[in-house]
């Protein structure tokens, strides 16, 4: 009996074709950073991945790299704030997946910081629309591919932040948006879990090395739908105060920031069979920060 049990466990942990073999995934904001790393990891585990990003050139580059490495990827660039694009994204993904979609990772987004008394309506509305409304609309558009009973796994991951859990000075808009997606996650889990077996989870990141945590002086920016440029990153003086000297990263028990690959690995774990009984939860990927 013991040997049979060992063989059974080994079979569950051995995925010769990859943990996501046969699955089709949409990953928004996957032209760079955490999203791109998530796409690469998913493809390495056998998934067909759709690269969704507002930057068409970056989306295509990631897709080309995955395909050149033997994976399967399709770039479908567009603006998450455009309802027509969301419909097209779902349509093209279903075609790419032979009528099926198994995974959505709502990762697209950026920060547009400002203290409460100086935050404009435009700053507020844009961040809420991008981080809350757009993920909801994408999930709603993809509902016919998740509300099915075919015995295949379905997963939705909403990306959040410790700003959404603990708040953060200068980020009232972002904090509210990232707190909001956890409510969306739990509602999906409760509505679509019982009948269709859909798992929904939130992954909340701490300090991860991306363009959002680089020095603002490096010049990274995004452009809003009406053409306004929004500078990304942290002012160099503020960044140096936290990261230099003997007190560097003292609020992180592991003593360092995380990499995009480490962040993406957490997303892979959540959608994998290894987390098959986990739903409606928030996984904090912070190096121990905010314990």
Task: Tell me what each language-model feature is.
Residues 3-15, 166, 266-269, 279-291:
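Short C-terminal tail/terminal secondary-structure segment
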């Amino acid at each position: 009996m013991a040997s049979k049990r060992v063989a059974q466990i080994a079979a569950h942990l051995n995925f010769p074709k990859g943990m996501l073999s046969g699955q089709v995934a949409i990953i928004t904001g996957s032209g760079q950073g955490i999203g791109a790393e998530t796409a690469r990891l998913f493809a390495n585990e056998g998934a067909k991945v759709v690269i969704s990003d507002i930057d068409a050139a970056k989306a295509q580059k990631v897709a080309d790299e995955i395909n050149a490495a033997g994976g399967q990827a399709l770039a479908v660039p567009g603006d998450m704030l455009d309802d027509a694009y969301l419909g097209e994204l779902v349509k093209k993904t279903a075609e790419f997946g032979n009528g099926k979609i198994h995974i959505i990772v709502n990762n697209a987004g950026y920060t547009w910081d400002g203290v409460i008394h100086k935050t404009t309506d435009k700053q507020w509305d844009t961040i809420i629309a991008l981080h809350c409304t757009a993920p909801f609309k994408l999930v709603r558009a993809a509902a016919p591919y998740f509300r099915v009973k075919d015995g295949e796994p379905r997963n939705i991951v909403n990306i959040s932040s410790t700003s959404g859990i603990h708040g953060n000075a200068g980020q009232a808009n972002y904090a509210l948006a990232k707190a909001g997606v956890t409510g969306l996650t739990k509602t999906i889990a409760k509505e679509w879990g019982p009948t269709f077996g859909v798992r929904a989870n939130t992954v909340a990141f701490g300090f991860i090395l991306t363009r959002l945590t680089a020095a603002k002086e490096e010049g990274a920016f995004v452009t809003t739908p009406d053409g306004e440029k929004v500078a990304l990153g942290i002012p160099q003086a503020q960044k140096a105060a936290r990261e230099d000297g003997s007190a560097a990263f003292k609020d992180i028990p592991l003593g360092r920031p995380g990499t995009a690959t480490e962040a993406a690995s957490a997303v892979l774990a959540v959608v994998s069979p290894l987390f098959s009984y986990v739903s409606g939860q928030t996984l904090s990927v912070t190096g121990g920060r905010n314990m």
